[in-house]
Amino acid sequence: MRRALVASVISIGLAASLISANPAAADGPINATQFGMHIPQLSQGLVPGVNYGSVRLWDSGVAWGLVQQGKNKFWWNGLDASIANANSQGVDIMYVLGSTPTWAATNKKQGTYPYKGAASVPSTKDWKKWVTAVVKRHGGSIGSYQIWNEANLTDFWAGTPKQMAKLTQVASKIIRKYDPTAKVVSASSTVRLQSAYKRFFPAYLKELKKVKWPVDVISVHTYPKGNGTPEDRSIYIDQVNAQMKKSKVPASKQLWDTEVNYGIKGPGKIKGQKIGGDTAAAWTAQTYLENIVKGVGRSYWYFWDAPNSLLGITMQDGYPGAIGYQTAYMWLNNSFYSCTEGNVNVCQLGDAVQPEVVVWATQGSGTYTVPANATVQCDAMNRCSAVTPGDSIAIGSMPLWFGTAEQNATNQATLLNRPVASP
């Protein structure tokens, strides 16, 4: 993304939920890296007011052409500072290797962001030199390297899926040689512009298969349309998972969502929308809950900054979106889980003896029976109140957590200090 720019009512208990259709379970606990972020001012030392586990370096002044400003001219200050600051915060780093510098562009009219010629296909020689320079300098500090941003859009990539697969293969060999523990992440593809997605994504997977899958991660961007909701995003994820299965992507390759927000205008004449209050908190928390249900390894929220005209949900201190993000982190981080999709989605966290439970409706509404051990419920705005086991609770798009007072106290102790929501 360029910076300019719930059904029928049911009554369900925990036991029933865990034997329903479409369960999702994990062998290990949810890692903090699930919670990704974009931080445009990272090089200046900005520290977000939420817990997060990974950062994607894009739209932060460190793109290829801003670092390598000529064939033999490098300006490393911004990238060095961004990596140092991310390391000091203890978060995993993803670096996006594209886009083509103006000086290396064969056609300077192809792409304008973040500079002229950015969508042009670079020469293999220039690409090798660049990737080698980055990996040799920062190998061991960067956790994953993403090949390109939104390569299904001609604003960012004017080449073919085959050419992108070639760049992917070339970069992967260099990364495996000099930074073998790092992950290689495919070029990302947006989903909401379906014509561009269908033109690029299946073909790119086909070409990656031909060169023996030189990636560890398949990446997409799951922004829904300007008037879209988390339900629409969930449909996109199902579509991507189906295509990955059809393309016979090995099960060892994770799916990451490397950009997400809501309310961004388009495609076409679809207007954007500003999303605040309870809706912002609910949708943000739903995003990360849906990830564990759908098998998405990470989502990088776009982005931590002041309110602007581009994005529907503001991610900033005190805003509901940030509180929803932080609350989801508090509930999920380091938890084992078992989830069930339905009209009311149910995720059991922790052990089966005294579980914590999170429930929400992706579409419509329903009811849920408070589990036997639960005495407290909290919503995604982190508002908590007492409940009685066996009571029937109305469930909508606002995720609700159920557990004991002791479990809630432990959760609350993980929160960072931040301003009380007011916007």
Model regions and ranges:
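Active-site mouth loops of central-metabolism enzymes
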Residues: 34-41, 116-122, 270-277
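Carbohydrate-binding surface patches
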Residues: 341-373, 380-382
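Substrate-binding cleft and catalytic face of glycoside hydrolase catalytic domains
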Residues: 50-215, 219-225
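Secretory targeting and sorting signals
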Residues: 1-26
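C-terminal beta-strand-rich structural cap/linker in extracellular carbohydrate-active enzymes
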Residues: 385-423
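Glycoside hydrolase catalytic-domain groove-lining segments
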Residues: 223-270, 292-293, 297-301
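Aromatic/acidic polysaccharide-binding cleft in carbohydrate-active enzymes
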Residues: 261-330, 339-345
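Boundary/entry segment of secreted carbohydrate-active catalytic domains
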Residues: 27-61
